[in-house]
């Protein structure tokens, strides 16, 4: 009988979450590099370049791929012949491992988990509790999968209760464009079919734990070998989702998904539950077994697994944000690449809610935003000699409902985030001759290298959601919504969908 010791299990969980914070799965890197090689849209290729370069930097520096180091998810398959030498419950051991990983002094990870989600929403400080799925199976080992998934992609999860005769392909192709770019494509789609609603969602999440291997399936189809129903569906969805032209970061292009994963389960005769969960550019998961011989040893990938490319935005225009005016902003056009220099402020969900509440009460804000830019970010705490930890953008659409009031009552000139802006936000930007700039999701460590000074200037009690002042040098951004309200995310995907020519563009 296998005996799993408490400390071995806890340390294995801790090591796994540290490991995936800075190592992409090699299969993801290989798939992204293939997409990079064939990409024809310069803006999308630039975004993929940043993701690939950032990934290698993180592997070398052992720092997080993304500032959103995710909510910890653990899949366990525990053999029936396993005995535990432990005083803690399995859940408590998992959570202790997560706690150790996220508070590690050499690579502190961001605590993003909030207790009392419908009320006070208070940070638990150590990213616990984890979400745990445990299954008792035959055997004498413990199979463990650890995954860290950020809010940007989790928030785009979808569930539909289709009629038995409804087309899954039609539903997916109708749904993907409604998800925007907040899930940070190019990524992987996980689809669960059948069972009950909660089973379909679990299948979709579990499917994302497998390796990217769509190229093997393409080779199988080309050889004339017979495909299963799910294999044929994977290939059809892979081709047609990419034909939508959404592209990397929603900028338009040839590749939106690097793979499509599907798991299914028998379902009721009256039902066809279908769930879809995307994995973002910060795909993070690792699998291992414990057999009682001690804690797991995870073999680091070789740096040779990363492509030898560098990021140098030669076409970027340097901008002094300390002297920014509406007149200068008006000269920027959708798609322009800028290199920001000077002081910017940060602020995301909680800070915006508090600022708007203060404005509604007639109170003075603690920061003067006149002619300033605000960056939607919740950075990782610094370690060693860092000014700030990884500091990539968060999804901008969550701030849409605050945009008009912030622009009209604070003197704010522009915003920096990831993904698209909604119609109302674009109108507010146009009405106020402001601007929205996009930083690349999945390039948090690369962005952090452009931040030369950082200090909290307001709302320190909000933790990672506090307002910081950053002094930046050559921080790369793209004009996503210009002062006339033109949005690259609204225009570019349709252009590339038409260019690919598989799916007609609706007028």
Name what the model sees in each region.
Residues 208, 212-252, 346-475:
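Feature captures the catalytic cores and cofactor-binding loops of soluble hydro-lyases/lyases
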Residues 327-330, 367:
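Residue "hotspots" at secondary-structure boundaries inside conserved domains
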Residues 252-260, 267-268, 281, 449-507:
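C-terminal binding/interaction regions
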Residues 337, 343-347, 483:
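Short, charged beta-turn/beta-strand-edge "cap" motif at the junction between a beta-strand
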Residues 1-312, 408:
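Non-transmembrane, aqueous-exposed alpha-helical and coiled segments at domain scale
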Residues 162, 204-208, 275-279, 292-294, ...:
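Short, solvent-exposed amphipathic alpha-helical segments in soluble enzyme
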Residues 314-324:
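Short, structured beta-strand/loop micro-motifs enriched in basic residues and often containing a Trp
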Residues 329-332, 338:
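Short, well-ordered loop/turn sites that connect or cap secondary structure elements
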